[in-house]
Amino acid sequence: MGSNSSKISDLPKNEYLKKLSGPESISENDPFWNQLFSFSFPAPTSSSELKLLEEATISVCKSLVENNPRTGNLAALTKVFLSRTRELRLSAECQNHIFIWQTHNALFIICCLLKVFIRELSEEELQLHFTYEEKSPGSYSSDSEDLLEELLCSLVQLITDTPLLDITYEIAVEAISAMVVFLSCQLFHKEVLRQSISHKYLMQGPCLPYTSKLVKTLLYNFIRQEKPPPPGTHVFPQQSDGGGLLYGLASGVATGLWTVFTLGGAGSKAAASPELTSPLANQSLLLLLVLVNLTDAPDIPNPYRQAVSSFKNTQDSSPFPSSIPHTFQINFNSLYTALCEQQTSDQATLLLYTLLHQNSNVRTYVLARTDMENLVLPILEILYHVEERNSHHVYMALIILLILTEDDGFNRSIHEVILRNITWYSERVLTEISLGSLLILVVIRTIQYNMTRTRDKYLHTNCLAALANMSAQFRSLHQYAAQRIISLFSLLSKKHNKVLEQATQSLRGPLSSSDVPLPDYAQDLSVIEEVIRMMLEIINSCLTNSLHHNPNLVYALLYKRDLFEQFRTHPSFQDIMQNIDLVISFFSSRLLQAGAELSVERVLEIIKQGVVALPKDRLKKFPELKFKYVEEEQPEEFFIPYVWSLVYNSAVGLYWNPQDIQLFAMDSD
């Protein structure tokens, strides 16, 4: 091709690619492969460059699909790569830059081709292209070696066994990307795939023994957040005279195949977004989430989920039960630190949810931490900026809070952690507040946001469940948190009255002659009354279990006591209103006895004195409020599209045409 190519769109005319995809068979020992693999470029990462690369690859693939049944060149390319991977570890130890660089380039080419093949071909056709036999040109045999499976196992071994050095960083990222590409057939199906070659290869056969090692490696990649090496340390720098070892390796190397990618150096500027400091960590986390969320194969549970559900702390010396497969140990302190630091991304929040929900060892460890604020504050910040987040990220953050609030120790300890100057909380200056009070404020704000915008019942339910779990352990509530609890009840009360009025008017008014259906006011009323009932139960739970710890809540209750009047005789709320009514009456009479024109400080003093005198036996006992998160049936219908949307939006150096995506709606968040 020479040095004239300057655009990715020229790739289909490239002589090396034309030969690879052409009608001539190329032997595995042909010097051609060294020429093909000897390119150096800043890998394209901007969507425009990646789109151009995809379009250019399609053209090459069309020719390859047509000719490969006769040439077997795809199999030859794969075998050359496989032979190189067997020497990769030794090459890394010997600092054999050239060998690693060429092996990376071979994998890059395979990955580009495989991505198009997976989209364009059926699984059967894909397998046929990888099962060519030289003995009988032009024919395929089911008895021949399964190169596709061998390729996948080779990628797994490359990820787990190759030491991570400056010179191996890029090939490690590329191997993980290639595995993501291998599993990407899910993107092109509306339905969740329950049987595929990926299930077959990854859940049985030679890949299976590497399960725990792969999961552990991907987790440690996430934990370590290794940054890519500085430019020039992983690829040979260009010699000033155009000579040197690199350029003497094969004819036309320096001005050959892939110089098109330099685009005058612009390619290097289109790096990952500034917040993505570790492509390896990002790609590892995405692959891990894809693997963990694969559906179980028939009669074979997902081994990657088993591994994630059972690993233990390196400091835990107790033996693993023999019945648990794919076990390993990892440093929980390092994992916890990484989880705390990385919660700005959807994928890190999803990993935290997965570990808390599925791994009891991790959950126990997290709940025992004395620096819980390091984990909870980033989660609260996600919820606080709800309008900037997608709904899935908000759900994950809320469910994490719900799981944490299932633990009484957590609910007690968060009120003992005092925070100062929460800069991201802008509604009010909070110079000093407990973590528990801040959590209440943020959850209530989320409910109010949901009431005015999305009106999502599922979101309401999770918010209220978390507050309910905490309510018996409310301690020393900040005055603003106490006010917001009552303010939320006020908002719900107004909404209830408005819906009730609309329902009454619709019954009185004439029947609508238009085709527009009337709103279901009965349904709306039922939902709002359910939420009001829940709020009353939360207030009641606090009053009956920790009244003496919360004078600010009693103060807020008395200040807005008129709000509760309409619910005293309401059949849906009569029982739960008894205690609230008793507390309001008891303290109201004490304030009346103290006279008028009382200061805030004096009112609080009267409340604190009255708490001691209030006869506790007069408060009716209710069952303790306890809600537990239970994953819905067929959770894969939610999680698999979500995970792949994260891959689509966040994977480094991977582009798919949005028009080809079937799994999720491209216009959704």
Swiss-Prot record:
Q: Lipidation sites of kind N-myristoyl glycine?
A: G2
One matching Pfam family is Dymeclin
Q: What processing steps or modifications follow its translation?
A: Myristoylated in vitro; myristoylation is not essential for protein targeting to Golgi compartment.
Domain of life, per lineage? Eukaryota
Enumerate the subcellular locations listed in this protein's record, separating them with semicolons: Cytoplasm; Golgi apparatus; Membrane
UniProt entry keywords in alphabetical sequence = Cytoplasm, Golgi apparatus, Lipoprotein, Membrane, Myristate
Q: Which InterPro entries match?
A: ARM-type_fold (IPR016024), Dymeclin (IPR019142)
Topology with respect to the bilayer = Lipid-anchor
Major localization class: cytoplasm
Keyword Transport listed? The answer is no
Q: Name one GO biological process term.
A: Golgi organization
Do you know which SUPFAM superfamilies this protein is assigned to? ARM repeat (SSF48371)
Pull one GO CC term from this UniProt entry.
cytoplasm
Q: Which family does it belong to?
A: Belongs to the dymeclin family.
Q: Assembly state and interactors?
A: Interacts with GOLM1 and PPIB.
Described by its record, this protein's role is as follows:
Necessary for correct organization of Golgi apparatus. Involved in bone development.
Name under which the protein is recorded? Dymeclin
Can you name the source organism?
Mus musculus
Q: Gene name, please?
A: Dym
